[in-house]
A protein has these predicted regions:
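Flexible low-complexity loop/turn motifs enriched in small/helix-breaking residues
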Residues: 1-154, 177-188
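Short beta-strand edge/turn micro-motifs at domain boundaries
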Residues: 157-181
């Protein structure tokens, strides 16, 4: 993705959760090279509840922006009604996997994205997830995704998740919330 496009990660498939307390302790993400809208397939983790997730890139549109804002507002209202505070979304990522050899990198507070990309020159695109926060009814959740590539500065996205049935979540995208410098600190 180029900085000119300011892409929104649009599609998201199904997220399988089988643990009775669906909170991630750490998340493993497998990342493929992203080239001109190529689909990125993220496969099952062996250290968290089984899940599947797929991502594709797309340009933002007024209708898309409106729908994303509605989704996020709906999730926030669910949290307000349930009087339960979601998990802090500004925490550092739990885990990162890069394309080249799928080596794991467990991040620490304050870690920058530029050193990660420099250490793994074969990685065109980096994706990391933070632990989601759930409302008390267990019908909605919010989580954060952080992405970085060689062409753009790292940025954060907020996702809304809606429960479809027992153990299955539909994940929807929401608006980009921050842009960060190469140090990993929010620039907003």
């Amino acid at each position: 993705m180029s900085g000119q496009e300011t892409a929104v990660i649009e599609a998201v498939a199904q997220w399988q959760i089988t643990h009775p307390q669906p909170y991630f302790k750490r998340v493993q993400v497998f990342v493929a090279r992203e080239t001109g809208g190529r689909r990125l397939s993220l496969v099952e983790s062996d250290t968290a509840p089984p899940w599947t997730f797929s991502v594709r890139s797309g340009k933002s549109s007024p209708e898309n922006e409106r729908q994303l804002a509605e989704n996020l507002n709906e999730a926030r209202e669910q949290f307000r009604v349930s009087n339960e505070k979601p998990v802090e979304l500004a925490q550092p990522p739990f885990g990162v996997f890069l394309e080249k050899g799928l080596q794991p990198i467990w991040s620490e507070p304050g870690i920058g994205w530029a050193p990660i990309l420099e250490k793994h020159p074969g990685a065109d695109y980096v994706v990391s997830f933070c632990r989601p926060g759930f409302n008390s009814a267990g019908t909605f959740a919010v989580m954060e995704l952080t992405e970085a590539s060689r062409d753009t500065e790292p940025c954060d996205w907020v996702f809304q998740l809606r429960r479809i049935d027992e153990g299955t979540w539909e994940v929807r995208t929401a608006k980009m919330i921050t842009e960060r410098s190469s140090t990993g600190r929010p620039s907003r």
